[in-house]
């Protein structure tokens, strides 16, 4: 039975990764709105820590490396930040599985999902924004200046993901839990 469970989880992980990449490409022309993060989090929440991390790393690598708007392979520190962030998102979903993967979703769960969406996106945005000035050797004041110059863009991304997590995850979890 163990091999059957492993195969089932492999297929589910592949489906989550494919969904994350497809939704990433489908929405890439809409600024500040993306569904990769929520799909990776759901993979961790549904399949556990290891599979969530695998889905996060694989889906972000495929999305970034093959992005028609510009491949992340051109700048290794950026793609490393993107992949690391999504691995962490999958890990977070998996580690919170015992607490949040329940059929009965309360208002506290909804708030927690929204908060997690905001915080995980903040981490992603921070790591990706800081990847360039740090790798390019900017000094600390220049690095802070570059980081602050992107806050308008990143805060909208964080708010939109907070809303997406709060609205979307409860609807999905009640069918998967």
Language model features: what each stretch is:
Residues 10-15, 38, 53-57, 79-84, ...:
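Hydrophobic alpha-helical transmembrane segments
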